[in-house]
Amino acid sequence: MTVYAVGDLQGCLEPLKCLLERVAFDPAKDRLWLVGDLVNRGPQSLETLRFLYAMREAVVSVLGNHDLHLLAVAHRSERLKKSDTLREILEAPDREALLDWLRRLPLLHYDEQRQVTLVHAGIPPQWSLEKARLRAAEVEEALRDDQRLPLFLEGMYGNEPAKWDKKLHGIERLRVITNYFTRMRFCTEDGRLDLKSKEGLDTAPPGYAPWFSFASRKTRGEKIIFGHWAALEGQCDEPGLFALDTGCVWGAKMTLLNVDSGERLSCDCAGQQASAKPAGPPA
C-alpha cells in the first residue's frame, strides 16, 4: 500500500485526476490523504466531492476552512459569498450524503504506523501533538452531534479569541481551536493569532512569525503535512514539515507527495483559477 498526500483541491478535480493517473493510484490498495479545502472557488466542487465520496474507503481527509464554510451555508448559518462555487452542491440530489460524509471528517489525522500528522493549516507552537489531538477531538464531537452542529456552525466565524486559554469554554473555545487548525498562518510564540496577513513569510506583522518557525514549538521532531498557505508555494525548510498548497485554484499547480518516499509530483492548473483572491473569511 502506498500513501499519497495532495494539497488543497478547492474544487479542481482534473488536476487531481492527472496526479492520480501519473502514480497509477489504485483505491483498492493505495490511500489518498487530503489536507482539506476540498471545495470552493474552483470549477468542479460538486464533482470533486462525488469523486472522493465514491472512493471514500481509500480517502483520509481533514477539514479545511472552505469545507466548514460549506457546512455552515448548508445549515443556513452563513450565506453564500460572491466568490463561492458551492451552489451546485447545495442543489444536488445527493447533497445530504455528501455533507454528512464531510461533517464526519476530522480536523487532525495521525497515522500511528508512519508517525505522520495531517492537518489543514497547522498546529500552534504552544501545543504538543497530544494536546492538539485532544483539542481537535472537541470540535469533531460538536460537528458529529446533530444538536450541537447548528450552534457550532453559527458561532465558529470570527477572529476572537485570538489566543488559546484553557479556561475558555463554549463556542469561544471551539472557535479558537478551529481557527488554529483551519486558518492559522502567523502567530506569536505563545499562540496569539494574526488572521489578516495571508501572503509570504516576509509579510508577518511585528512580533509575529509563521506558526512553524519558533524554536520552542512543541511539535518539533514531528512529521506534519499541511496545506492552506498557497503563498509558501510548497516551500517549508523546517525539518519534518511538508507544505502542499501550491495554489492550484489560482492557476499555479497541484502537488502530490508520496508520504513514504518523500517524492513530489505536480500538475499544472492553468484554467482552474478563481477570478479574484478573497479579502476576508473563509481564507
Curated annotation (Swiss-Prot):
Q: Does the keyword Hydrolase apply?
A: yes
The EC number(s) this enzyme carries: 3.6.1.41
Specify whether Hydrolase is a keyword of the entry. yes
Extract the GO molecular function terms from the UniProt entry.
bis(5'-nucleosyl)-tetraphosphatase (symmetrical) activity
Q: Point out the signal peptide segment.
A: none
Per UniProt, the keywords (alphabetical) are:
Hydrolase
Task: Name the family the entry cites.
Answer: Belongs to the Ap4A hydrolase family.
Q: What role does this protein play?
A: Hydrolyzes diadenosine 5',5'''-P1,P4-tetraphosphate to yield ADP.
For this entry, the protein name equals: Bis(5'-nucleosyl)-tetraphosphatase, symmetrical
Gene that encodes it: apaH
